[in-house]
Amino acid sequence: MNLSQEHAINQNLHKNQKNEEKIEKKTINKDGRGQMNYDGEEGQGEKSRFQKMVENEKIEEPQQKDENIPNTDVIERKEVGVIERINSEDVPILMTDNATDYKVLQHNLKKGKVSKKSKEQIEQISKQEENDMLEYLKNYKSNEEFTIQLEDLLSFETYFSRDELHLLYREFKTISKSGMFMSKEDFISKLTPFSRNADLTISLMNAIDRNGDQKIAFPEFVQALSIMCRGTKKERLRFTFEICDFNGDSLVSRDEVYSTVKAISDIFSKFGYSKDKFGDPSEAVDSIFSSGLTTNGIYLHNKKELTLNEFLERGELNPDLSKCFGMFDYFYLKFIGQIDLLFKDKEINMNGQLTKIKPKTIFNFNISHRRTLSLRDGFLIVYKKKKFKHDEDKPSKVIFLPGSTVKVVVGSQPSKKKKFLSKKFHNYYGFRVTKGNYNRFFLMENRDEALNWVNAIRFHSRQGFRFQSFSKVRSNISVEWFINGSSYYNELAETIRRAKHEIFITGWWVSPYVYLQRDNGIENMEKSRLDRILTEKAKEGVKVYVLMWNETNLGVQLGSRHAKNWLEGCHSNIHVIRHPKRYPLSWSHHQKNAIIDQQIAFVGGIDICLMRYETSKFQLTDDQGKRFPGKDYGNLLGTVIRTGDPKKDQFNRRECPRMPWHDVHTKIVGPSAKDVASNFIQRWNHAIYVERSNRFQPILVPKNYTGLPSDDAKPDKWKNLVSNIRKGFSHVSYGREKPTHYQRAGDNPKVRSHTRQGAFGLQSDQIDNKIDKQKNNSTNSENSENSYSEFDEEDEEGNQEEEDEDEFDEFEKDENQKQENSKIPFNNKPSDAGGLKSKNYKNNNNNNIIESLKDEESFELPGTPKIDLNNDKLLKSIYHLSSNMSENSCVVQMVRSICPWSAGTDVEDSCYKAYLGLIKNAQHFIYIQNLFFISSCGSKLPKNRIALAILNRVRRAITLKEKFRVIIMVPISPSGDLALASSRMIIGWTNRTISQGGQSILELLKNEFPDVDLDQYISFNSIRQWEANGDRIFTEQIYVHSKVLIVDDRVAVIGSCNINDRSMMGSRDSELAVVVSDQSKLLITMNGKPFKVGKFPHTLRVGLWKTHLNLTDSEISSIIDPITDNAFINIWRKTARNNSIIYKEVFGDCILENQRRLGIVQKKYIPKTNELIVQLSQIQGVLIEYPLDMFCESNLFNEQVGIFTAESYVDVSIFT
């Protein structure tokens, strides 16, 4: 082929430039199918170039390369060739982020079965394959079949670079007999794993074989692979539609889609992972065909069949639909995954000036602009090139690249509309970036420059890591947990004061008037008010950005307009955005984060607003308003007024107790904090782009500041260690919270005793290092990304029992003795015979620890006793009394629920996938605290299947006779005032999930296992507090607002996501959570056997139990192993039952959990008598049982719901 022939090809390649911009139209060929061109557009009856080439079965002979043709040798191609390309749409949903496990999965897929080889052997095989691929690229020369011209055509028309095309051709030749064509027999036997499903196999082949000649040419194969693994979401949805359309009638039915999902689900288990992320096949089908609301609140009706347009519309609601429920993952793993791993460590950041083409502007011209582009940290940052001024600190556009697609575009002679362009662009090369509604051409003078930018953008577009999250799994992160608002607010205030550059804050509710520190007098408390701290930092030059939910729901008033005006009036460096402006009316922004200098992030369930400050005392009264001033004294079961004067009380403090607020938050330091900042930047910029009223707000970009904010204010850990050792261990308590409660008449010291908290900060590297040296299994041998949450960690009970036995003997004997001493028979009357009030329960373990100190092999601090590092009892006790931070040892990933309305991106439901995956793979126990527990065991509503995952895991434990425990803690009334029909409906949905309605967890288990005592497996709990004040005794539920999942003390999920469809489906409320495992391992017992757990999730779980059970430090050892009969039955369940019995006897039907029907008047207090005080003093902690029969005699969905109430007209999904 000579130059004129090549130029003719280029002219034909893009002679119809409108195909890049037109609206696609459906055409039906003879068999009823739509004809799709290889660029992903619908055909208009004209055959594509590839179709013509395939029909003629003619590939032109390579000609001698002309000197004028740009150099395409191996070295040059390698520079712009294959890079890590992990796009949101290319990485399989089921893959782990562990490279070895990923290679095992690829090896299984290539062999077509589960390999018996070890991971080490497969690692060696994979390494050899990588070397072979690199050698192939180095020595590759064009041949008679795969010519340079065909290479050019494919690289321009697909999402693959030249090197990738060569490697794909190498793989294709191993499958096909002829080299360029694959027969139907080869396709069925070697390419697809669905040979047993004839309909699916034929449909898939028809989708790839565009000309219908029953053969697949290499160009057809590459184009289909390009769409499946790297195409736009619309392209992949169209391809999915064709695969599911078995009969070619341009409609897909429930049966067709179900057959597809079922076949894929079956084949996945064949290759060694049955960890199905798509749920039950019926769930996937229901998500497409059932009725419901879109992300913008548009109602979709139930459908039996879907057209292409309907399929595309509903595809926006399901993040798995564009993956063809995993089929595209299969092709990615089989053909692309190994290529992506070749350059997995290569990072590409770029800067340069390009010409941007904005299509179809005024007068139907394509307008060109010169732009400066910067590519870094997953963002494409566009700066305007101004004639007199160029300020790179003010970008004109910032594009969050994960989820985007980029494609090389080559042009020939310009059309009439482009003749105004410079002549150097008449034969142009460039690329097109597509992300959501953003669609732009960028032009360059040569191909190599275009390919460099394309490869770099593809690298930064990577997404879809574990749980299909936007965030990578990152190691060596410092994470700190906070139980309740007081400790979190205090740390937040100190961190904000150390900010040097930027402060990001987002929340469901942000109040300028919340006091963050309340322990050091009125003057310091006033200084700690949020608006004053932010103003102080703004005056220092720190930029403050606050993103609030604009309460579009008329039933909720948070005063966001006043908060915006107030904060922006404090200083010009404070910027506030309220989003969205008008719709959706049904959904909300629910993320609760603060980010300091893009280096430190706070993530969890606590908003920075009124009524969230709480201590571990769970104080009910504050007559003088010293700790809870004005509207900070609140009770959700009454009429809450969140707007107006914040200093004005909304309740009579003598008549109404406050409702304590129980929550959990985290502090993250390290690269994962950058992921939280990226999430904020994406949402902030999206709010600017979609709302014209925000156009004057600054656009944010990711920045890499050097040096963490100063940490001088933090207490010295060694000083704490010296002080605590001198005083002895008996005073040491869990966590960092300082004493905050002043004693008053009427306080119950038995209930309040658990509030004494110190700071036993045994966190130093010296101590940890010396301890690690004494362990037989150093955590250094752990793979930095091999966390429990990757699902492939083997059962350590069997693998490590032998090697840990010697180390564990002494500790095991001591633990068994403690358990024997505290096992007491239980009866229904609260007494010293059960729970934590047993006289035999307490032990003097700490005194024994002090007495057991030895002098040999110890370390010494000046003025302190020597600590024996070989004494297991001492070390284990210290571990469980350590602080709430794990420094530089955590494996962290951010997960979220996000969608087009909330962030301008495709639907992401990685929170949901994390919950499903972790629950399904739990080995010993599941611990959940959540505001809501609204889920389904298989019914159409709710749509999320977290309850089903729990049900199936308990089923498996019962069938296999495993000792397995599940604890689920929710509030008694999660939605506030029961006078509202919406609040009653939410309780109704909760009860349907747990114990009522016929399809609940407990009902299904009882029907299936009638002879099994379910109390041995699952416990539903709430928490409640009482307090005497003057001549009255108050009681109130503690509002469980935390969103925590802990599995096996090895992994924890903490964030803002509730267990309901609103939070989990991804297409509704915006959410953010952190998945944490810890490489710092602690050796404990699990069911009495040696078991290694992560320090962070273990200490968090123990800290929560200590708070709920009111444990002293000497009693902690009894809950270290959470699944023994002693911990779960004798302590947890019996304490909850004893406390519930006392509350019922003292308060009767005055409290919600004792009411079986609606309409019974509640009372917040009863007259105080000495007898009642004595009886209530037997309550241990705050734990109670969740009332399974609450309102069982009332229909919460219809009773007291009139035709004039809003609940009668809104869609039921609002409540689920």
Swiss-Prot record:
A Gene Ontology molecular function term of the record: calcium ion binding
Polar residues: bias regions: 1-14
Domain PH intervals: 347-462
Activity control mechanisms: Inhibited by butan-1-ol.
Knockout consequences: Null cells show a motility defect; migration speed of vegetative cells is reduced to 73% of that of the wild-type, an aggregation ability at lower cell density and an ability to initiate and finish aggregation rapidly. Have altered cAR1 expression.
Domain EF-hand: 196-231, 232-267
Keyword set, alphabetical order: Calcium, Cytoplasm, Cytoplasmic vesicle, Hydrolase, Lipid degradation, Lipid metabolism, Metal-binding, Repeat
Catalyzed reactions per annotation: a 1,2-diacyl-sn-glycero-3-phosphocholine + H2O = a 1,2-diacyl-sn-glycero-3-phosphate + choline + H(+)
Gene Ontology CC: cell cortex; cytoplasmic vesicle; filamentous actin; membrane; protein-containing complex; pseudopodium; vacuole; vesicle
InterPro entries on file: EF-hand-dom_pair, EF_Hand_1_Ca_BS, EF_hand_dom, PH-like_dom_sf, PH_domain, PLD-like_dom, PLipase_D/transphosphatidylase, PLipase_D_fam
Superkingdom to which the source organism belongs: Eukaryota
Limits of the PLD phosphodiesterase domain: 585-612, 1036-1063
Enzyme class: hydrolase
One Pfam family matching this protein: PH
Residues noted as binding Ca(2+) in the record, renumbered to the chain: D209, N211, D213, K215, E220
EC number per UniProt: 3.1.4.4
Comp. bias regions, Basic and acidic residues: 17-33
Region (Disordered): 1-48, 732-844
Composition bias type Low complexity, residue spans: 776-789
GO BP: cell motility; chemotaxis to cAMP; gene expression; phospholipid catabolic process; phospholipid metabolic process; positive regulation of exocytosis; positive regulation of sorocarp spore cell differentiation; quorum sensing
UniProt-annotated catalytic positions: H590, K592, D597, H1041, K1043, D1048
Subcellular location per the Swiss-Prot or TrEMBL entry: Cytoplasmic vesicle; Cytoplasm, Cell cortex
Biased composition, class Acidic residues, residue ranges: 790-813
Main function: Plays a role in cell growth. Hydrolyzes membrane phospholipids, such as PtdCho (phosphatidylcholine), producing the free headgroup and PtdOH (phosphatidic acid; signaling molecule on its own). Involved in the inhibition of actin-based motility and endocytosis. Its inhibition causes complete collapse of F-actin organization. Plays an important role in cell migration by localizing along the anterior cell membrane. Overexpression leads to the inability to aggregate even at higher cell density. Also known as a negative regulator of quorum sensing.
Protein family per UniProt: Belongs to the phospholipase D family.
Descriptive protein name: Phospholipase D B
Source organism (scientific name): Dictyostelium discoideum (Social amoeba)
Upper lineage: Eukaryota, Amoebozoa, Evosea, Eumycetozoa, Dictyostelia
